[in-house]
Structures are given as structure tokens and as C-alpha cells.
Amino acid sequence: MMKQEQMTVVRHKPIAKNIYELMLSGHLVEEMNAPGQFVHVKVTSQADPLLRRPLSLCRIDQNARECTLIYRKEGIGTTLLSEKRPGETIDVLGPLGNGFPLDAAQTGRRALLVGGGIGVPPLYELAKQLVKKGVIVTSVLGFQTKEVVFYEREFAEFGETYIATVDGSHGTKGFVTDVIHERAISFDVLYACGPKPMLKALEQMFPDKEVYLSLEERMGCGIGACFACVCRVPNSETAYKKVCCDGPVFKAGEVVL
């Protein structure tokens, strides 16, 4: 159930160039169940910036009532957020969205997790929960360059993990699709989160596979009221789906990328 709470900053630190890891505590964590969901964060108590920032859930620890968010500092809002210190509070609304379908990967089957840039974080909690239910997990993570790579070691705890960088400074030179092709990675179900070109490439690469894609879109309200994050439905000029509440996770082919 969606709630709003002033959550407390437990830990906040940079983990790569302009990439921050933010741990929050509060009762809101008790409502967080599905990996792939997100929260809407108000970065300041002031009127400006007005809009909240959607941040995906990276880790969920309901016993400790703590959750971890990872974000990129790139604008006024996230720059203000990066200045928050332990002990301060942040206005958080959530959890929002549908999350990844865990039931799509059965015990003993193989799941391929593919993340691009800031689309990597929600796959961590997914990997953790899949491994817990006996699914064999392989992760392929793509970044622009070595200095923005994060969570390689953390994902490796759950299974084989491969890195691709566009400039070749770490791992395979190229894109996540290059790694999948070169390594001939086999899987039963694919989960991915990242920029649209990456998601579209995966959709085209595996037309006969079970593929779930988490979209990254700019959002206004986060609850389906403002229609700022709509995606077109195939074979229709008028039908749309909202990323914030119908998604952010869609089965491949469900929306036009």
C-alpha cells in the first residue's frame, strides 16, 4: 500500500563518479515487497524544485526497516539530494509501480538480468530474491566507462556477472548485447532495466523468449494522474499505458519502445 513518510537517512555515500548510495529507514519499508518498484522522493522541503524524483529500490530489508536507493547526480534536484546527511529526513512517497514478476522464473530455471547504467539498481533486489527461491542468476551490466561502474562485486555474490563498457575501459568493450552474444548466455527468462535503446535491442534480439522490461521515464506525479509518462500500446493510435502505475515493468511487446 502506498504511503508517505519522513524517512531518516542512515547512510549516504558516493560509490562511483556521480553515483550515490542512499540508505533510508522508516515504517514505509514494511510496504515494500516487489523488486522493481520505486519511490518518489521530495529532494527539499522548499517549493523549488517542485516535482519529486522517482528512484528505484535497490535493497529492501524489512526486518531492519531499511531500504537502499542508488541514483545519479546530474541536475538541481539530485544535487540537492546528494547533500543530505545521516540523521536528516527525506519526504518519501511509495512504494509505486508493479515490480518484476518473480513467478516468471521457477526454481532451478535460469534467469538473465540485464542492466544499463542507473537501470542496474532495481536488479539487485531482484537477484537476491530469485536466488533465494532457487533460480540460477546470471547478470550482465552495462556502463559508459570504468569510473561509473558500481555493484559488480555485489551482483557476483548471486551468480556469474559480466560487465560491458562502451569505451572498453572495464570488462567487454561494447554493449550488454555484445556480452550476451559473445558468451552465448542461455536463459529461460530475461529481466532488464535501462535506457530505451538497450531495452529495444533486447526485445528484438529475443522475440521468442520470455522478457520483462523496466522502463525509465520522467514522471510528474508518480501515481497515474498527470499522464507525463505514458507509452503507446502496439497497433493502436489512441491506447496508452502509464509507466508509473501500469509499469514500470512490462512484458516485451506490451508497449512501444
UniProtKB/Swiss-Prot annotation:
- Pathway recorded for this protein: Pyrimidine metabolism; UMP biosynthesis via de novo pathway; orotate from (S)-dihydroorotate (NAD(+) route): step 1/1
> Any idea where the FAD-binding FR-type domain is?
2-102
Keyword Flavoprotein present in the record's keywords: the answer is yes
> Which free-text remark accompanies the cofactor?
Binds 1 [2Fe-2S] cluster per subunit. Binds 1 FAD per subunit.
Record: residues binding [2Fe-2S] cluster: 221, 226, 229, 244
Gene Ontology terms: biological process: 'de novo' UMP biosynthetic process
Domain of life, per the record? Bacteria
Signal peptide interval = none
Which GO molecular-function terms appear in the entry? 2 iron, 2 sulfur cluster binding; electron transfer activity; flavin adenine dinucleotide binding; metal ion binding; oxidoreductase activity
Keywords recorded for this protein, A-Z: 2Fe-2S, Electron transport, FAD, Flavoprotein, Iron, Iron-sulfur, Metal-binding, Pyrimidine biosynthesis, Transport
Obligatory cofactor(s): [2Fe-2S] cluster; FAD
What Pfam families has UniProt attached to this entry? DHODB_Fe-S_bind (PF10418), NAD_binding_1 (PF00175)
**Residues given in the record as FAD binding sites:** 53-56, 70-72, 77-78
Asked if the Swiss-Prot or TrEMBL record annotates the protein with the keyword Iron, the reply is: yes
InterPro entries the record matches: Cyt_c3_hydrogenase_gsu, Dihydroorotate_DH_ele_sf, Dihydroorotate_DH_Fe-S-bd, Dihydroorotate_DHASE_ETsu, FAD-bd_FR_type, FNR_nucleotide-bd, OxRdtase_FAD/NAD-bd, PyrK_electron_transfer
User: Of which family is this protein a member?
Assistant: Belongs to the PyrK family.
> What the protein does?
Responsible for channeling the electrons from the oxidation of dihydroorotate from the FMN redox center in the PyrD type B subunit to the ultimate electron acceptor NAD(+).
Record NCBIfam families: PRK00054.1-2, PRK00054.1-4
Describe its assembly: Heterotetramer of 2 PyrK and 2 PyrD type B subunits.
Query: What protein is this chain from?
Result: Dihydroorotate dehydrogenase B (NAD(+)), electron transfer subunit
Q: To which species is this protein native?
A: Geobacillus sp. (strain WCH70)
What does the organism's lineage look like at the top?
A: Bacteria, Bacillati, Bacillota, Bacilli, Bacillales
